């Protein structure tokens, strides 16, 4: 549950740090609301419990806690302006020794937006419409290495240079659409020349069933590499070969459903197709995900299976299929969610074996 507080303290601090004249010039206000929200999440995980290939790093702590701030105020009738900034996962980063800055504010959804009964517009860093559905409900519990970021990955996830519109509900129907330009690693803020994408999703709910569909298309620019100079073993300067850059046209789509079944059961399934085409080679791969769950009061059981099928390059099948079978037992105790998850990840290495992933954790949303 979001906790609300008036921005009087923040406004006062800004006013004290400024002259009275400057405060008036920048328009410091103290009459809008700020929501503070987040997730406290800690788990103990081993990604290779059976130590296949002598490749287990043992059990480690994963801190997936995050926090966000959302300020909002009605600018005029039926037009509410919202600013949100949200951190990434804290992880167990050693900041002093070059740790990845995933826990910084602005790493997750961070935007300026406006909303009313006409819908919601967000400008900044948000999920793409397709990835929103890929992520939930079809990548949980623990299916992301296959259905989310696994495979040839011809879709984006969260992008910075993006404008997204979400419609209101028209009966049981709603949709979202976005355009963007970002193509940096990890969705960084600097766009690449000629890189762009657009996407959309749609949902239709009736009775206890929701149908979902999404599509995304874009152009990724892969830069030229090589051409640098180095000394060979005789001390002679030689130039490394130049590998030409290229543009990858991307395309991805998803169709799926969620169903709430009698007696506490639920079922969700989706099929996803992806394609990369640079004009010289065409790389295609299909994936699917099936998730079932059962709830009896505060106790829940969730079982999921996701797989990437063998991809094809110019119609030739590749030997790169993999899959995950995952099960999770969880409870809800006064808002806290303790859980145990065991997953079998198969064919993710050249040995074509199965790694057993075990995780025990606790989460609490606020």
From Swiss-Prot:
This is Chitoporin. It is found in: Cell outer membrane. GO terms for biological process: monoatomic ion transmembrane transport; polysaccharide transport. Residues 1-23 form the signal peptide. Transmembrane segments: none annotated. Involved in the uptake of chitosugars. The gene is chiP. Gene3D superfamilies: Porin. Induction: Induced by chitin oligosaccharides but not by N-acetyl-D-glucosamine nor by other sugars. GO terms for molecular function: porin activity. One of its GO terms (cellular component) is pore complex. Keywords: Cell outer membrane, Ion transport, Membrane, Polysaccharide transport, Porin, Signal, Sugar transport, Transmembrane, Transmembrane beta strand, Transport. PANTHER family: OUTER MEMBRANE PORIN F-RELATED, PROTEIN YDDL-RELATED. Belongs to the Gram-negative porin family.
């Amino acid at each position: 549950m979001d906790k609300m507080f008036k921005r009087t303290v923040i406004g006062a601090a800004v006013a004290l740090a400024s002259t009275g004249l400057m405060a008036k010039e920048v328009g410091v206000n103290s009459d809008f609301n700020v929501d503070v929200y987040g997730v406290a999440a800690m788990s103990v995980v081993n990604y290779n419990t059976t130590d296949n290939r002598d490749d287990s790093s043992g059990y480690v702590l994963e801190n997936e806690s995050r926090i966000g701030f959302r300020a909002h105020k009605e600018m005029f009738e039926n037009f509410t302006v919202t600013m949100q900034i949200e951190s990434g996962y804290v992880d167990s980063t050693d900041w002093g020794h070059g740790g990845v800055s995933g826990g910084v504010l602005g790493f997750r959804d961070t935007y300026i937006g406006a909303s009313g009964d006409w819908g919601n517009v967000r400008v900044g860093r948000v999920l793409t419409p397709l990835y929103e559905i890929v992520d939930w409900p079809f990548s949980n519990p623990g299916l992301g290495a296959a259905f989310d970021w696994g495979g040839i990955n011809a879709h984006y996830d969260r992008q910075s240079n993006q404008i997204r519109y979400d419609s209101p509900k028209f009966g049981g129907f709603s949709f979202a659409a976005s355009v963007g330009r970002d193509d940096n690693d990890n969705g960084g803020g600097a766009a690449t020349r000629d890189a762009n994408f657009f996407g959309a999703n749609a949902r239709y709910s009736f009775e206890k069933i929701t149908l979902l569909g999404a599509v995304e298309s874009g152009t990724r620019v892969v830069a030229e590499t090589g051409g640098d100079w180095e000394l060979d073993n005789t001390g002679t300067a030689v130039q490394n070969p130049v590998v030409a850059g290229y543009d990858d046209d991307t395309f991805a789509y998803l169709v799926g459903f969620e169903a709430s079944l009698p007696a506490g059961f639920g079922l969700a399934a989706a099929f996803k197709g992806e394609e990369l085409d640079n004009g010289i080679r065409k790389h295609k791969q299909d994936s699917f995900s099936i998730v079932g769950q059962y709830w009896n009061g505060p106790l829940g059981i969730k079982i999921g299976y996701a797989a990437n099928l063998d991809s094809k390059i110019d119609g030739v099948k590749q030997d790169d299929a993999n899959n995950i079978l995952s099960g999770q037992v969880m409870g809800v105790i006064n808002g806290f969610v303790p859980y145990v998850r065991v997953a079998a990840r198969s064919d993710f290495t050249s040995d074509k074996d199965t790694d057993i992933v075990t995780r025990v954790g606790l989460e609490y949303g606020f």
